[in-house]
């Protein structure tokens, strides 16, 4: 046993210090990034935000809607090959280039993903969907995936420390997913006591990944557009969003009605709801590590997407970053004990 004394921070613990700016308008900010990935050698350009690979967020409908904003969607792994074929037949090449194919790490998952990728060459992203990226099995699966799909861009995780981030990159991952426990419907931290404050995880993993030519995606912990800006400011190349994109028409959650008001169910992928739906229930040897919540219906996702992108542009103007790429080097975090004036929050 050992104790680390270093302070670790989450998004709620900091604000971004404003700096002089020559920008006249938020419209002057360029949010599009251009990347060439380490292993796949694929080039990509777009807004580096990803809808999470949850079946109440990462749907085909979400992918179609967010593609118009140049945003990626990690489509959840529970669609059948036949459903993928129907989606591909009805989607433009522009939509498909904004799609990540999610997979588990079993042999059956591998074969299914192979079939999906063979359906259309425009599917260039693979997202390896595992809660615990510290398992040797995950490292082996990443290496297997890299050998099988040398030109596909592979995202793998989840981890929160630099040494494991490096291990996944050296095994073949182009992008490492960073985050254990910060999600809005994740209960891993309270069920297991395991986790890491998200901002510190992003800062440390970005440093490790960038030293090897890899990239990271901050996965979880964002509740506002300001948190998205903090993740990018901390060094994230991509930011993955779940709860912020849940409850919309495109989110895919089941709609329930109470007292004449309609709600959409949103749950973590290790929750009892998810396991009942996909594997028949919670196995006797494990605990559910997610919760289910009822969200008021939020309408089309386009309004939320505009709000997130608008907040991100505004953050860039406050620090003088004309491009999202510049946000990290222009970010100075200050530690705080309050984020906002909450006097009217309950009205």
Swiss-Prot record:
Residues engaged in binding K(+): 181, 183
One GO term of the biological process aspect: purine nucleotide metabolic process
Record InterPro entries: Aldolase_TIM, GMP_reductase, GMPR, IMP_DH/GMP_Rdtase_CS, IMP_DH_GMPRt
Xref: Gene3D superfamilies: Aldolase class I
Keyword Repressor set for record: no
Active site positions: 186 (thioimidate intermediate)
Keywords: Metal-binding, NADP, Oxidoreductase, Potassium
Listed GO MF terms: GMP reductase activity; metal ion binding
Enzyme Commission code(s) on record: 1.7.1.7
Pfam family, one: IMPDH
Binding site for NADP(+): 108-131, 216-239
Catalytic activity: IMP + NH4(+) + NADP(+) = GMP + NADPH + 2 H(+)
GO CC field: cytosol; GMP reductase complex
PANTHER family linked: GMP REDUCTASE (PTHR43170:SF5)
Record text on subunit structure and interactions: Homotetramer.
Family according to the record: Belongs to the IMPDH/GMPR family. GuaC type 1 subfamily.
Protein name (database record): GMP reductase
Gene field: guaC
